[in-house]
């Protein structure tokens, strides 16, 4: 009996090419299995406590940026318009949650002592994960023993740094209270979930990569339900000071995405969690389908023009592969939630990549940027953009970007269908389902909703 190796070895070059095409087609079909979004939970700046209040903020074009609250740090003590001033920064703005101290530890069976040692990111994410499950119509305490995955983006560890100068405050709970792995694992532990639990740190794309990994886990039958998203809280001035010294932060306290005034971003914070399920299972179980993930992709720049600098060819590649994974044409996408940091370097590079892939077509395509509303949520930025995209698809309305007057002079949109929405507008009329995309440096996701939920 001939082995597979023998059969392939005996093939002609033409036969091997044909077999490769068949394998490639089969892998694309498997990778394009649609994943339903069945629940959403979020805590975001501007008093956002869920998808309804988030949509109100977006549709009304509200800015959630304020001066740094006194319970974080003394903004005036660290402020100096001179970027070179040691220990000072030319910004005192950000976008913050109203309350990060309130936590019902008893509800989750956590002692007050352990709760005090927990990074507020752990506390907030645990609450938002619970709320997302409730939004999905699921009883969180009834999921024990289920193959439910938890994939969350977590970035900085500023709470742990608070103990650096006061070792007397460190106890046994300080280790578990500050570990990224426990931020995710605690959700699985408290709910008794048996699927994979993974903490993801890919910097600003962390939460979008988490969604990508959760979709892959569902497609591979590694899990039957997944919680995906991320959290980021700005607790201390040191990180903000370092970013300011890089020249990344706007001295005006605004994010001018794609605008001629782009001079950096504003830091924001928050948490977002989506509940994901294979579409076939969601339909079978009668779940409310809020949106459908058709495909996604992740890559890395490799050795390029700088460790922290974006790379246009890599961006084009990841967007192209996400569309290929989704098996949908670029021209069918009418809304892209961009990375849109409002930096003189990043915006033109991102626009060039988007224009190369999405620029051609008849129907206009809007470039959204929620960072203009609430700053850069860093580890939670991707999920904030993802939830915005799902809500935009649901409501059939494209919300406005803020702080846009005139294109960055190094961007030329004239030969493309891309535009920046400056007021709320109806979704372009079409017989096709609504489709949107989310772009974050290093990852891209294609989301759909509407007729046929595709």
Predicted regions and their residues:
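N-terminal acidic, proline/glycine-rich, low-complexity intrinsically disordered segments
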Residues: 1-7
């Amino acid at each position: 009996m001939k082995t597979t190796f023998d059969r392939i070895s005996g093939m002609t070059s033409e036969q091997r090419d044909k077999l490769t095409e068949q394998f490639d087609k089969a892998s694309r079909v498997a990778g394009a299995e649609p994943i339903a979004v069945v629940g959403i939970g979020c805590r975001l700046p501007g008093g956002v406590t869920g998808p309804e209040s988030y949509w109100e903020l977006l549709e009304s074009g509200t800015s959630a940026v304020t001066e740094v609250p006194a319970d974080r740090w003394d903004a005036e003590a660290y402020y100096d318009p001179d970027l070179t001033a040691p220990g000072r920064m030319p910004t005192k703005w950000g976008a913050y949650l109203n309350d990060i101290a309130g936590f019902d530890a008893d509800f989750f069976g956590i002692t007050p002592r352990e709760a005090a040692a927990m990074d507020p990111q752990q506390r907030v994410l645990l609450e938002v994960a619970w709320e997302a499950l409730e939004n999905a119509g699921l009883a969180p305490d009834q999921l024990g023993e289920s193959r439910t995955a938890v994939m969350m983006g977590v970035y900085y560890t500023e709470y742990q740094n608070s103990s650096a100068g006061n070792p007397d405050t460190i106890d046994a709970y300080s280790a578990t209270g500050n570990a990224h792995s426990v931020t995710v694992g605690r959700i699985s532990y408290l709910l008794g979930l048996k699927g994979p639990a993974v903490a993801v740190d890919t910097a600003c794309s962390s939460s979008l990569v988490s969604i990508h990994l959760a979709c892959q886990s569902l497609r591979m039958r590694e899990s039957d339900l997944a919680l995906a998203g991320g959290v980021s809280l700005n607790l201390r001035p040191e990180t903000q000071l370092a970013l300011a010294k890089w020249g990344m932060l706007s001295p005006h306290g605004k994010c001018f995405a794609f605008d001629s005034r782009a001079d950096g971003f504003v830091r924001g914070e928050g948490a977002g969690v989506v509940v994901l399920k294979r579409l076939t299972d969601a339909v079978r179980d009668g779940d409310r389908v809020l949106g459908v993930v058709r495909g996604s992709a992740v890559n890395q720049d490799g050795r390029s023009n700088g460790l922290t600098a974006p790379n246009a060819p890599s961006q084009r590649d990841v967007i192209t592969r996400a569309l290929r994974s989704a098996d949908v044409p670029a021209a069918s996408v009418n809304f892209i939630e961009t990375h849109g940091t409002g930096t003189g370097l990043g915006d033109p590079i991102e626009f060039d990549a988007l224009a190369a892939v999405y620029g051609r077509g008849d129907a206009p395509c809007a470039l959204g940027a929620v960072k203009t509303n609430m700053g850069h949520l860093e580890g939670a930025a991707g999920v904030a953009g993802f939830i915005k995209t799902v809500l935009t698809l649901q409501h059939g309305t494209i919300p406005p970007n803020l702080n846009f007057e005139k294109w960055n002079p190094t961007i030329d949109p004239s030969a493309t269908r891309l535009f920046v929405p400056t007021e709320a507008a109806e979704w372009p009329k079409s017989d096709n389902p609504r489709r949107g995309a989310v772009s974050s440096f290093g990852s891209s996701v294609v989301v759909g909703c509407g007729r046929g939920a595709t």
